[in-house]
Amino acid sequence: MLDVNVFDELRIGLATADDIRRWSKGEVKKPETINYRTLKPEKDGLFCERIFGPTRDWECACGKYKRVRYKGIICERCGVEVTKSKVRRERMGHIELAAPVTHIWYFKGVPSRLGYLLDLAPKDLDLIIYFGANIITSVDEEARHSDQSTLEAEMLLEKKDVEADAESEIAERAEKLEEDLAELEAAGAKADARRKVQNAAEKEMQHIRERAEREIDRLEEIWQTFIKLAPKQMIRDEKLYDELVDRYEDYFTGGMGAESIQTLIRGFDLDAEAEELRTIINEGKGQKKMRALKRLKVVAAFQRSGNDPAGMVLNAIPVIPPELRPMVQLDGGRFATSDLNDLYRRVINRNNRLKRMIELGAPEIIVNNEKRMLQESVDALFDNGRRGRPVTGPGNRPLKSLSDLLKGKQGRFRQNLLGKRVDYSGRSVIIVGPQLRLHECGLPKLMALELFKPFVMKRLVENEYAQNIKSAKRMVERQRPEVWDVLEEAISEHPVMLNRAPTLHRLGIQAFEPVLVEGKAIQLHPLACEAFNADFDGDQMAVHLPLSAEAQAEARILMLASNNILSPASGKPLAMPRLDMVTGLYYLTLKKSPEEFGGQGAYQPADENGPEKGVYSSYAEAIMAYDRGVLGLQAPVRIRLDHLRPPAELENELFPEGWNQGDTWLAETTLGRVMFNEILPWNYPYLEGIMVRKGGGADKIMLGDVVNDLAARYPMITVAQTMDKMKDAGFYWSTRSGVTIAMSDVLVLPNKDEILDRYEAAARQIETKYNRGKLTGRERYDRLVELWKDATDEVGQAVEDIYPDDNPIPMIVKSGAAGNMRQIWTLAGMKGMVVNSKGDYITRPIKTSFREGLTVLEYFNNSHGSRKGLADTALRTADSGYLTRRLVDVAQDVIVRVEDCGTRQGVRVPVAAEVLDATGAVSGYTRHDLIETSVSGRVLAGDATNAEGEVILAAGSDLTELNIDLLVEAGIQQVKVRSVLTCQTPTGVCAKCYGKSMASGKQVDIGEAVGIVAAQSIGEPGTQLTMRTFHQGGVGGDITGGLPRVQELFEARVPKNLAPIASADGVIHLEDEGNFYTLTLVPDDGSDNVVYDKLSKRQGLASIRVPMEHNPAAFIERTLAEGDHVTVGTRLLRGAAAPHDVLEVLGRRGVEQHLIDEVQAVYRAQGVAIHDKHIEIIIRQMLRRGTVIESGSTEFLPGSLVDLSEAKLANSEAIANGGQPAELRSEIMGITKASLATESWLSAASFQETTRVLTDAAINKRSDKLIGLKENVIIGKLIPAGTGISRYRNISIKPTEAARNAAYSIPTYGESIYGDDGFGEFTGASVPLDEAF
């Protein structure tokens, strides 16, 4: 057996008949499977034990040899080898065919490889192979030439004979006619009768003449055909062929069926053909050249690979092992069998019948028919349904052939190799576990016992609770009390992995430390929900157990939930407080006036009535006052603090040297805000403001910003602890805030009718004008839509104004916990305009709110939008999943392979934006809007210098937040950064060009699978976009841009509303041609004018930005007009430019920027942040190849697609050897096409078009170097990414116990004011990644 981990590449090729016979253990001669009485396999049949091995371990078929001691003996009675029955999964047989057959993949695939090789049209091939026409395989030119005069003389003689025969026949007939006429005359017949006889005779003589002529023509045709006879000539006329064979069989050979094809292939000279084709390519033009190119691809493939083309015609076919096409007995005594057995049986039956007929010497026509049937049965076995009607089984179901076993989602590749099931796993419903730490999950006791069974059994024996494993197993099954104690020990320090389907990004599977819980539901930490996109309405999750020490270490260090707080897509925190927690923190940090509840005991300055009130000497004193009920949680007070760091401005003012713990300062704040700051690390600057999740403003602090800042300043462990404290505080205070929703909280607008009456009157006016013909239908529609939108807005504003701040509904919205103001308008104001099935607004709005209830008509109008939202979601979720699959496939081999590729190239990105004062002059600089997604986390490619030329940051510096601020201060508007688009690493990318990992905030590790992370980062929000449409009230919220636009871009398709682009800088001239414009571009450089005709008026001309006349610093937008000056690459119509056009006009960098901007535009419109580097990785894969224009002295074929890095190597080799380099043109490929063009045939075959990819790979004898992830998963090796790359594989360390304890020690969280709340004690945290251990 092969050791699975020892080979480096996997090659696929064409098998010859000898190979097939060599693999085989014997010939299958009979179509029988098993004996119906004994149920034993039949001898020489499809399940024969002599060929495939014994059905029982160490036992021959007749029972003479039993037991392992006879291992390897071949029984002399039944001929079966005594061995394990497992060999029936690996031993192959074969069928010797009585006549050769072609392999359907090579003949029927598109393009037909056989057709290209032999230069035959697929239609003709079909006729030959299926016995519809004859083909000449060889002609003895010399013999024909030397005997030509003799043969010609013979032919002339034959013609003369035919003529002479005809003449004599005609003479006889004339004689007979004379006799007949004489008789008639003697009998006194009338002239009429005599004429009849004469006419009949003349007709007969005419027939004789015509027959002779036909025969002579036929002879002439036979002779002419014979003289011009050439190999590969088809003769469809069977009689003509028979005549040729009868007369001249010594001078040529020919025939029909696969046999003649085989003869042609055997006599085929690859080298000569390749030479000839190259000549045609160099000298020819047009169609001829194109065909030669296509043919050369196939011919050169055989030439290069050393494959024997005869392998495309089979003399023997392999029979796969019987265990892979099993026959199983069902309950009713009937048998179920794999379709392959049926297909093999047909082949064997027809083959045996053909053998018998050949032996009996049956007529050729019968033999040919049987050969055709054999060919069809082999076709059905290899690829059923590829040609003609598929072979069907019972119930008219097409049988599954060998090709069908590989294809599609249910095929071998995707179902069994890439989609394996996993042992040591379980699944259950999830419920919330608010008492858990961030790195913990609650595991049901029963599930844990089953998962950890082997560990528990081992410990039971070790701790001497059980004598042996068997009794330990019994103890576990009976759930003895001591089992639970041992289980506690077994699960400690042993992380488990939780996964929620659909796993859209890498945070869909994370590791947690299990905590045993009662019940049968898994408990999930509330902060982990966002990453899993989980909620507790019946979602289920799967649990997986890492077994080996390495797997456990990996789960704990790389996958622990507390180490995965940041999103790999944008670097923003995902484990954020949400929903109740946000409400709780919002309530905790509110500020109220003394009159309101919670505002009692507020600060009052000293006056004549006494000293100041609401001042506390310490936090403890304030807590005491709160406990007594004197002080409200949200009352503005002054508290002297010494254990919290003051805000930055205050610190600079009070403690110029810097604040130290113990230094006191007076905080003007509320007790709630001090409590919130208690949660944060002690040296984090004090936060004074209301905590909200979204919608900032004065006195409001975004929780996201806080978590972001924490993640940047502190180690992950501190962030995780702080997040947990936030969660506890959030739940604690949201419970105590009493925020609930009841019908009575939805306040109804008292003056709503008055507002609506006003708008009703205006609507009636519009209708009247329309009825009088003063408005067109379109104007009426536009005005009514505008009017009712204003009405909805006015009612909405009025609703917002009547809600007091302490009403729970605005509290939930303002804190950013859930919902938005629009939803409150719908609840309490009015729903407004809705859309009909055509997508137009219905001009009667929904005037009622949900609180009042809709009328029947309004309900009906509303139903369409709601349904469309749900239907769209279902459809687009599937679309998004498919997009993710294609993205993953195209980028799966992009792995960080080296530290630095050493390039000085890069791309320019914006850093600072100018701030203009009232006069339009630059008054300063601010951070550019796109810094988050395009600049942060990169490495400088060149020095960043200011206007004076001073170097602010040297090349190679990381663009951290601090460094970016330096650049903005210096007024540097653009910098050149390293990018994967310009990375010079031949396979994968280098760490410097990639920059920092968004998920860790540190430079990316070598071995990181950045390609897959990129694909997930783009695909995951794709699903989010598609899932989040219906929240915006049905149809109004749909985006056509959305997913279809992203797909269009990544597939590099011509967009739906195509806009041509200017191919040069120049001035435009417009001509109106009715429904179209003709636009002429006059280039500035004086080159030829470019004419764009048939530009649709409906699409409309593009808009351009032009400076205002009186203020050139300001710009206005207007549509293109006569005489406008445009720059290269400007769109000329509204719509989108085609990526191929952009590549042609603006070059590689232009199309890269175009794609990034367009993709980002779609995501930004949805408020989704994705870093540019992820999109860049996909674009790099799309632009990896080029078309060979001139091959120079390289091996490349003109017109073929080659990898640019490969071409670079080949060119440098050619130049070094004094040859000519190849000329290439950059190509942009859609992601599907790029995936299929990948070097790895395993990866391409498992993606799409499996049979086509394998056919191609086999002809080229492709070798898969196993550098991507997919290939290695398929063959069951560790993936070459992460800890699977060789530099991490070949180390062995054994830490001491002390080191292990230090590394895995779990610090406690210390005391907390929420500790005694019945939520349980808190211990546990993540592994501190920052310690070098």
UniProtKB/Swiss-Prot annotation:
EC number: 2.7.7.6
Domain of life: Bacteria
Positions with a binding annotation for Zn(2+) 1: C60, C62, C75, C78
Note describing how the cofactor binds: Binds 1 Mg(2+) ion per subunit.
CC per GO annotation: DNA-directed RNA polymerase complex
Top-level EC class as recorded in UniProt: transferase
Catalytic activity: RNA(n) + a ribonucleoside 5'-triphosphate = RNA(n+1) + diphosphate
An example Gene Ontology molecular-function term: DNA binding
Keyword field: DNA-directed RNA polymerase, Magnesium, Metal-binding, Nucleotidyltransferase, Transcription, Transferase, Zinc
GO biological process: DNA-templated transcription
DNA repair as UniProt keyword: no
Pfam families associated with the record: RNA_pol_Rpb1_1, RNA_pol_Rpb1_2, RNA_pol_Rpb1_3, RNA_pol_Rpb1_4, RNA_pol_Rpb1_5
Residues reported to bind Mg(2+): D535, D537, D539
InterPro entries: DNA-dir_RpoC_beta_prime, DNA-dir_RpoC_beta_prime_bact, RNA_pol_asu, RNA_pol_N, RNA_pol_Rpb1_1, RNA_pol_Rpb1_3, RNA_pol_Rpb1_3_sf, RNA_pol_Rpb1_4
Residues engaged in binding Zn(2+) 2: C901, C983, C990, C993
Cofactor: Mg(2+); Zn(2+)
Chain's role: DNA-dependent RNA polymerase catalyzes the transcription of DNA into RNA using the four ribonucleoside triphosphates as substrates.
Subunit structure: The RNAP catalytic core consists of 2 alpha, 1 beta, 1 beta' and 1 omega subunit. When a sigma factor is associated with the core the holoenzyme is formed, which can initiate transcription.
Similarity comment: Belongs to the RNA polymerase beta' chain family.
Name by which UniProt lists this protein: DNA-directed RNA polymerase subunit beta'
Organism: Corynebacterium efficiens (strain DSM 44549 / YS-314 / AJ 12310 / JCM 11189 / NBRC 100395)
Organism ancestry: Bacteria, Bacillati, Actinomycetota, Actinomycetes, Mycobacteriales
